[in-house]
Amino acid sequence: MPSFLRGILRPKERHHENKNHSQMSSDSLTSSYPTSPPKLEKTEAGSIISSTTQKKTSHHANLTITTKTEQSQRRPKIIDQVRRVESLGEQVSQKQRHMLESLINKVYTGPLGEELVQTLYLRIWAMKETPESTKILQMREDIRDQYLRMKTERWLRTLIRGKKTKLRDFQKRYEEVHPYLMMERVEQIIMEEAWKLAAHIVQE
């Protein structure tokens, strides 16, 4: 074949070969990486997301219902316990007040009161003389007894103040009035006797 024909034919052959090669490469790439239509992917993804969201929402709703049910079951028990404790506190406080009033009534009317005023009279008579002790010893007996009962009642109400009183409460109140008692020996004697009468109430 003449050389000039070879020069003409070779570019055409190369162009044809390149075209075939590029087509084959394209086909091989297409066959190697199969893809789905974009719309189908989006649709499938959307359905998957929607399904997952529904599952999560349903699960969350179930948890919420369960939690509310548990809370509703617990709440009555907690409320009952609180009410029971409060009612016990009220009962104890009422009992203590009732015991206090009953004790004061005995101080004025019963044999306990008679024994109390005799004890106070003897202790005041035996103590070192003070203006207050002298005044009490010079009183007429019935007036003196009533006076000592009233003093005792005042100390009882000071020691037992309505609400539940414990031993530490009495100790605190005693510390508050201690300086006064050191100057008023008669008051200290009456307070001590009042405490002896009220000790069983404080310990309830």
UniProtKB/Swiss-Prot annotation:
It comes from Human parainfluenza 1 virus (strain CI-14/83). Transmembrane segments: none annotated. This is Protein C. Belongs to the respirovirus protein C family. Residues 25-34 have a biased composition (Low complexity). Residues 10-20 have a biased composition (Basic and acidic residues). GO terms for biological process: symbiont-mediated suppression of host innate immune response; symbiont-mediated suppression of host JAK-STAT cascade via inhibition of STAT1 activity; symbiont-mediated suppression of host JAK-STAT cascade via inhibition of STAT2 activity; symbiont-mediated suppression of host type I interferon-mediated signaling pathway. Residues 1-75 are annotated as: Disordered. Residues 60-70 have a biased composition (Polar residues). Keywords: Host-virus interaction, Inhibition of host innate immune response by virus, Inhibition of host interferon signaling pathway by virus, Inhibition of host STAT1 by virus, Inhibition of host STAT2 by virus, Interferon antiviral system evasion, Viral immunoevasion. The keyword Flavoprotein does not apply.
